[in-house]
Curated annotation (Swiss-Prot):
Taxonomic path: Bacteria, Bacillati, Bacillota, Bacilli, Lactobacillales
Broad class of the protein's primary localization: cytoplasm
Known function: Specifically methylates the N7 position of a guanine in 16S rRNA.
Family membership noted in the UniProt record: Belongs to the methyltransferase superfamily. RNA methyltransferase RsmG family.
UniProt GO MF annotations: rRNA (guanine-N7-)-methyltransferase activity
Protein name: Ribosomal RNA small subunit methyltransferase G
Its EC number(s): 2.1.1.-
Length: 237
């Protein structure tokens, strides 16, 4: 997917990028490739692949109408080089984006990237989701949480749902259908007072399969969740 094909694909969804937004995506690509040599951010570095498998893939929830261009508080867990939240932020500047990542070198890259792209209302924190999820400044604080290929839903739900306000939603972007994951995650969702709103399979323009699963928080999360760092993965709910 060339940059021009990327713009055209967005235009079909009535998203027409300004010259500044196009420049932001171009600079994002260039900085990603430049810094990838230093800190190994991604295995995908060819321009057409980055525009398809990072940029376009990240904005699927926008194209599907699941995220409006409003000043919602969005948390991205394990965003790596900023996916999916920063491509969303470029397109919908009103979003207030927070990223938590466990590797400090990625946080340094994100700070540099945000400055270069002139993004405001973006906040980056180094640490574990299990720790921040028990911090009153983060817990039950967000309208949306996104996670792209981070963990199985059984584990991911405990890492993310405590951050949501009641009525808030987890948007889990997956590389394949989530039917089996949802079955396995059902006990965790019950314990976390959340339920599946939708799970939709779709394709990228090149035919690659993807899945977007949305989980809605129904009641306050019990205080004991998330458990200590490492426990959600070692002993899933």
């Amino acid at each position: 997917m060339t940059p021009e094909e990327f713009y055209q694909a967005l235009a079909k969804h009535h998203i027409n990028l300004s010259a500044k937004q196009k420049e932001q995506f171009d600079l994002y690509f260039k900085l990603l490739v430049e810094w990838n040599d230093k800190i190994n951010l991604t295995a995908i570095t060819e321009e057409k692949e980055v525009y398809l498998k990072h940029f376009y893939d990240s904005i699927a929830p926008l194209l599907s109408g699941y995220i409006p261009n409003e000043s919602l508080k969005l948390l991205d867990i394990g965003a790596g080089a900023g996916f999916p939240s920063l491509p969303m932020k470029i397109i919908y500047p009103q979003l207030d984006v927070t990223i938590i990542d466990s590797l400090n070198k990625r946080i340094k890259f994100l700070n540099l990237l945000a400055d270069a792209l002139e993004l405001d209302k973006v906040h980056f924190y180094h640490g574990r989701a299990e720790v921040f999820g028990q911090d009153k400044n983060f817990r039950a604080h967000f309208d949306l949480v996104t996670a792209r290929a981070v963990a199985r839903l059984q584990v991911l739900s405990e890492l993310t749902i405590p951050f949501l306000k009641v009525g808030g939603q987890l948007l889990a972007l997956k590389a394949s259908a989530a039917d089996e994951e949802l079955k396995t995650a059902q006990n965790a969702l019950n314990l976390l007072f959340s339920q599946t709103t939708s799970s939709d399979n779709y394709q990228l323009p090149n035919g690659d399969g993807r899945n977007l699963t949305i989980i809605t928080k129904k009641k306050e999360t019990p205080n004991k969740y998330p458990r200590k760092a490492g426990m959600p993965n070692k002993k899933p709910l």
